[in-house]
Amino acid sequence: MAETSDCRDRTTEPAPTCAFVLGGGGALGACEVGMLRALLEAGIKPDLVVGTSVGAINGAVVAADPTVEAAEQLAGLWAGLGRSGVFSGSMFGRLQVAARSRTHLYSSAPLRRLLEAHLPPGVDRIEQLPVPYQCVAASIERAAEHWFSRGPLVDAVLASCAVPGLLAPVKVGDEHFLDGGLANSIPVGRAVALGARTVYVLQVGRIEQPLSVPRLPWEVAAVAFEIARRHRYARDMADLPPGVEVHLLPSGGPVGRCGTAGQLRYRDFGLSGERIDRAYRATAAYLADA
């Protein structure tokens, strides 16, 4: 059975006051790296990190080492993502994986190797992270969100990143998990439930842009998913208790193709550097005025 999690986990630690919430967003997750660098340079460090999908990757690195140097390390990780084999390879290779699996296009092995290479030696379990950390995945068997707050770190992150159709479901214990964005894409409510009073939301820019009516067949599902993910975030924001302060950090605007289809491109890593720089400048300016 997968290790369970609720808001009472790690009760021996003091309640967090400052949380970093890192949302999902595929290749657009590079924006979060610029935001992290701006936060850490401003002397803002988290007592709690929660993440979804690509935000689970960025969040794990900063929870392992909440320093400017870690943000710079993340920038290096993003610079190498296009060459890492995570979402690369020939069409023939993808078709071979799809033919064998009948469910997905890519192996999760390159992503596992990348995570293991960028996490500190000896940090194998979530409990070993210096900063309390949780990431979310969607349980197939229970059709519900599942929060990982202890157990093998890389397995939890892989579960949170298992994009349907691209990567295989990840088995942890007796359950199988898919991408956390299916259940909770920007988990502000989780951070608040765990006690955070100041929340910094690191998002990839989607919620800054209005949705448009789909005009092509493949845009229909994308728009439907965006409505679902934004509705959950809007509900969390509407339900904030008194005394909780939330900072929605700016992404600096879109880089590359705009529109719903452009936002959901998962292999567009070539623009990572520009996305990091824009988000860094925008967030640094926001923090200076806050």
Mark where each language-model region is.
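Patatin-like phospholipase
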Residues: 1-52, 60-290
